[in-house]
């Protein structure tokens, strides 16, 4: 998570005095990178994933499950292990392969929570299709190595949040008193955060800059026996340890909301992030733009966060909770008071959805941009004067409206243009759902794009499936020159929609109707590139070479997640409600059919195609509702637990059983045993996984069946394309 430099961290009053200098030096470093790397070319597209784990203390003999705060000890054990050899019962052949040098061992990193670990592959992945099928095994290896360096009762699990973090009583091992000087939280101790000086300083300076504690309020789910209006019973209105304890007496904890008051409730969440290296800056900017509208769709599809602080929430995803947990805006910047000491009103937290498009794509219309975007005009002019184009200068001038939160005194002695520390101080604390990453100062790697919205999934199979899916989408985007542009404010709206309970099934999202590029023929007629890469002229060569653009509002409409992922025809066939928003000629092909059409256009053996089909099939079924999201499964697990009183309370007993089930699923996945024996013991596993953890082949009909399926998918895509062309 961001920079882990060492030094003397400045408290906010001192840091505030140096903020302008850090921004100025950061821009100089950015221009140094820009001028050095703007012409950089890379032959291969590389990518990597980041998996975040919660570490829990769990024993069947103990009455409760706790968060383990031994991150530092675990990381030290991993660092001291010279070879990271895998012992115990990891996947067959793993240790032998590692010893033989055939497996690149993973890298482990600290995170904000002292109960968290982050793991990344030891080297970036390429785009060879067979390599995509090694991702899942690598994720299993990471989890196995981490477990081997923990105590016997410690387990790395991939739940987004620990259900009872911040609940009354003991929820960590070891346990500490709450209301410490850094977080000043009623609910969690300072010791829950990584002790590296960056993390407590980040939390303290966010609070200090705001002038009050962060306010993370999540609507509570109203069940049959939930008191209404509901008042958070864990809030102590009589606490007087710190001035910020007045927050709850001043309305920070409204009725019918679960109230949380510290950065740990956001940055203590786990997620799945994917970073791509583009061949050059142009391709990177294009990927950034085209993946941006997909963010809310994948957020809803990976929903896995229905519980906070021991209560069931009326939302399914983590995004806004993290946004609020690191929101450093002052009352003036929030619009609560007139501007006097601050420069502008800022509509979003520094953890938010994107506010800019940055590509040089000619299809990027001005109407897609945010008309109320806040930028620093002086910084933009500096970037323009330094040779940066207007679009990218606008992007960075927007990021640099923020103050640096953590400043080390040692870094203020002189400007070093061989580093990027001041630039990254601002860049890495703008946590948007996409991040555009310039090369480092030594220019050793290329321009990168980070896809950040997805929730972590319970199993390595699921996390591999979503990782590979995003990679394949980027390949289809670049190969077919797809266009997913919608106004950026509609992406914002979609991000809010994604938070709703069962949003993947019950909500609609703004999405572009026609993703296909329109080409011009030599004779002046228009043509459209098909999903197979060929150019098919349309009838009517008398059409103008460049047809006039219609209203932007005609380019997009509301679609379900099922329709976006699987296509209009599939959604109509599988949904109870017919898609009413699709008028004649507005059928959307679907992301999976587009990906499958791309796969059909490249050389690939059937075994590899079957392996990829297994991942796509999981996503297809999650989108259609045939399989549940993790959020839905967790809700149903709680509802069916004999200890649940239909009062929205997730007790210690329920939490232990839920975490125990997740651990058991992971253990069986690691050993390749499948989950058949758990069905009946753990409710609704078949609705979460179907047959995917039972070892069933996705290509049961053999090569002929697979080839027929590919032809059908390609026909669907081309049929939709033709309809769009006829409407032009």
Curated annotation (Swiss-Prot):
Cellular compartments per GO CC: glutamate-cysteine ligase complex
Pfam families membership: GCS
Source species, domain of life: Eukaryota
Q: For bias kind Low complexity, which ranges apply?
A: 523-536
Recorded catalytic reaction(s): these are:
L-cysteine + L-glutamate + ATP = gamma-L-glutamyl-L-cysteine + ADP + phosphate + H(+)
Q: What is its EC number?
A: 6.3.2.2
Name listed for the protein in its UniProt record: Glutamate--cysteine ligase
Name its species.
Answer: Neurospora crassa (strain ATCC 24698 / 74-OR23-1A / CBS 708.71 / DSM 1257 / FGSC 987)
- The gene behind this protein is gcs-1
